[in-house]
């Protein structure tokens, strides 16, 4: 006799989640398209046991952040705005300057904008590791290369 069909909704438990490590080479990749794929894997939406309120995602290591591609005139025109809530506390970072000083920050900002802005989102964001060059210290985790279209 076969098993009976069950119509119960599956909810993943944190202890049951199997986490993998992936490495993404950002060289020549379009920033937004790459960031959306990374956010999907960090969130765990690529897994059949995805549960919205549980961290079911995997770890992502991004290398060559300094060689990420920006379409259009974004390299000259795009900027990130922040304010310290004090008078005169406006801080504007231009992408052109960030590519020279902190290229990791560009990918981090793009991915953070695609994650939920709550406690779960901060937990997911901690699983993203971004490096400007091609070297990373996570070889012992044996990350699998992930292709991004």
From Swiss-Prot:
GO CC annotation: cytosolic large ribosomal subunit
Keyword Ribonucleoprotein belongs to the record: yes
Alphabetical UniProt keywords: Ribonucleoprotein, Ribosomal protein
SUPFAM superfamilies: Ribosomal protein L13 (SSF52161)
Gene Ontology molecular functions: mRNA binding; structural constituent of ribosome
A GO BP entry: translation
Domain of life where this protein originates: Bacteria
Subunit structure: Part of the 50S ribosomal subunit.
Family statement drawn from the similarity comment of this UniProt entry: Belongs to the universal ribosomal protein uL13 family.
Function summary: This protein is one of the early assembly proteins of the 50S ribosomal subunit, although it is not seen to bind rRNA by itself. It is important during the early stages of 50S assembly.
Name of the molecule in the record: Large ribosomal subunit protein uL13
Gene name tied to this protein: rplM
């Amino acid at each position: 006799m076969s098993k009976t069909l069950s119509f119960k909704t599956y909810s993943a438990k944190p202890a049951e989640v199997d986490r993998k490590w992936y490495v993404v080479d950002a060289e020549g990749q379009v920033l937004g398209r790459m960031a959306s794929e990374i956010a999907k894997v960090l969130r765990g939406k690529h897994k059949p046991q995805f549960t919205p309120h549980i961290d079911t995602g995997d770890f992502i290591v991004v290398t060559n952040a300094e060689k990420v591609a920006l379409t259009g005139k974004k390299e000259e025109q795009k900027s990130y705005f922040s304010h310290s809530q004090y008078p005169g506390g406006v801080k504007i970072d231009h992408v052109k300057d960030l590519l020279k000083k902190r290229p990791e920050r560009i990918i981090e900002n793009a991915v953070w904008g695609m994650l939920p802005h709550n406690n779960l989102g901060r937990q997911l964001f901690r699983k993203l590791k971004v490096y400007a060059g091609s070297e990373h210290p996570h070889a012992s985790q044996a990350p699998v290369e992930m292709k991004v279209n």
